[in-house]
Amino acid sequence: MFEVTVSKRLLKSGIIVSAMTLISRVLGLVRDVVVANLMGAGASADVFFFANRIPNFLRRLFAEGAFSQAFVPVLTEYHASGDINKTRDLIARASGTLGVLVTIVTLIGVLGSGAVTALFGAGWFLDWLNGGPAAGKFELASLLLKITFPYLWFITFVALSGAILNTLGKFAVSSFTPVFLNVMMILCAWYLSPNLEQPEVGLAIGVFLGGLVQFLFQLPFLIKAGVLVRPKWGWKDPGVVKIRTLMIPALFGVSVSQINLLFDSFVASFLQTGSISWLYYSDRLLEFPLGLFGIAIATVILPALSRKHVDAHSDGFAHTMDWGIRMVTFLGIPAMLGLMVLAKPMLMVLFMRGEFTPSDVEQASYSLLAYSSGLLSFMLIKVLAPGYYSRQDTKTPVRYGIIAMVSNIVLNAIFAWFYGYVGLAVATSMSAFLNMALLYRGLHLQGVYHLTRKTVWFVARLAMAGAVMTGALLWQLDTMATWLSWGISQRALTLTGLIGLGVASYLAILLLLGVRLKDLKAATE
C-alpha cells in the first residue's frame, strides 16, 4: 500500500512539473526558431551561443545543480523538525552567503569578460592576437558576455527560491518561471534586434531582462509561504557549513554533463565556423525531452528521497528510486529513438528558414544524432544522482563525475581530430553513459538500490517496443530531398503524423507485451 501512495503522489507532482515545463520548453523552441531565423548558424550565432552558455553553465553549476542538490536535503531536515524559525534562519543565512559569493563571481565575469572569453574561446582569442579572421568573434563575445553575465546573479536566487518552494511541495511556480526568459528573448528578437546594428546584442539584452523578470516573479510566492527573509551572512553557521560541505564535491558530481558541454565549446572554437551553432541547436532539441521528463522527475524525486532518508524509511527510498527509473525509461527510450530517426525532419520544421539553410540542417542533424544516443543516460543521471545527494553523500558521485569528465576530455581529443564537431557530441554521450553506469553501480554496491527482476523485464519490453517503433518510422520516412521539395505546412503535417505513428506503435506494442499503467508504479519485489 505504501508504494502505491508514493507512486501516486510522485506521479501527481511529476505531472504538474511536466505540464509547467512543457509550456516553458515549447516557448523555448519558439525562441530558438526566432533566433535561427534571425542569425542562422553563422559567426554571429556562434558568438551569441558562446556568450549565453557560460553564465548558463555557472547557473547549473552553482545554482540549479550543486547548490540545489546540497541545499534541499539540509532544508528538508530543518523543515521536518517543525521549527519554522530555525528553517527561516537557515534560508536567511544560506541566501546571504550565496548572494555575496555570486555577486563577486558576477562582477569578475562582467569586468573580466575579455579574460573569460580568452579562457573558454581560446581559438578566437589566438586569432585576435594574430589578427586572424576570427578576431571579430573574440571582441563581440567579450561585449555580449558583459550583458549576459548578470543573468547568473538573478538566476541563482531564482534557483534558491525554487528549491525552497519545491521543498514545501509547491512545484508549479519554479517549473513555470523559465517561461519568462523565453518570452523576453522572443520579444527582444522580434522588436529590439532588427533595430540594432548587431542583432545579437538585442538577444543578450533579452537574456538579462529574462533573468530579472524571473527573479521578481517568485517573490510574491515566497511572501505568501512566509519564507521571504532578509539575507544574512552565515559562512560559519552550522546549516551553511553542512551545505558547503555537501556542495563542494557536488560541483563536479551533478554538473559533469555541463562541464563537458562547455569543454565542447572550447574545442569547437578551434573548428569551422558554425560548429558551436550546430551543437547548440542539437542540444536544444535534446534538452526538450530531457527537461520535460528527466529534470521534471528529478525535481520531485529529490525532496521525496530526502524525506525518506530523514525518516529512515529504506523501503520507501528504494520504491521512490524504482519509480523514477521506470518513468524515465518509459519516456526516455522512445524520445531517444525518435530524435535519432527524425533528426533532419525536426530540424527542418523548426529551424530551416531565414538564415538557417538546408546545409545547416544537414550539419546539425549529425550532432543531434550523436547527442540523442546519450539522452537516456542523461535522463537516468538525473534520477540516480539524487540517490546520493538525498543521503547527503556528495563524495561518491564526485569521484564518478571526475572519471566521466576526464574520459570526455580524452574522447574529445580523439574524436574531434577525426570527426570535428560531431566527435564532440559523440564523446559527450559516451562519457554520460559511463557516468550513469558508475552511479548505478555505486548505489548497488552500497546496498541502497538495485534493479528488481520486474523492473529489468519492464525495461526489456520498453526496448522491444522502441525497436518496433524505430522500424515503423524508418519505413515511412521519406528522403531529405523529398522533404526539401515540400512547403513548411506539408513538412509540419508529415512530421506530426510520423510522431503520432511513433507514439501509437510504441504504446500498441507495449500493450501486446502486457505492459499496463500499473507497471509504472514501483516494484515491491
From Swiss-Prot:
Function: Involved in peptidoglycan biosynthesis. Transports lipid-linked peptidoglycan precursors from the inner to the outer leaflet of the cytoplasmic membrane.
Organism in which the protein naturally occurs: Vibrio cholerae serotype O1 (strain ATCC 39315 / El Tor Inaba N16961)
Transmembrane domains' residue ranges: 10-30, 32-52, 100-120, 140-160, 171-191, 203-223, 247-267, 285-305, 330-350, 368-388, 402-422, 423-443, 455-475, 495-515
Primary location: membrane
Protein name listed in UniProt: Probable lipid II flippase MurJ
Pfam families from the UniProt entry: MurJ
Cellular component annotations (GO), alphabetically ordered: plasma membrane
UniProt cross-references to InterPro entries, sorted A to Z: Lipid_II_flippase_MurJ/MviN (IPR051050), MurJ (IPR004268)
Gene: murJ
Membrane topology: Multi-pass membrane protein
Entry-linked NCBIfam families: murJ_mviN
Annotated compartments: Cell inner membrane
GO molecular function, one term: lipid-linked peptidoglycan transporter activity
One biological process term in Gene Ontology: lipid-linked peptidoglycan transport
Keyword line: Cell inner membrane, Cell membrane, Cell shape, Cell wall biogenesis/degradation, Membrane, Peptidoglycan synthesis, Transmembrane, Transmembrane helix, Transport
Signal sequence coordinates: none
The family this protein is said to belong to: Belongs to the MurJ/MviN family.
Pathway(s) served: Cell wall biogenesis; peptidoglycan biosynthesis
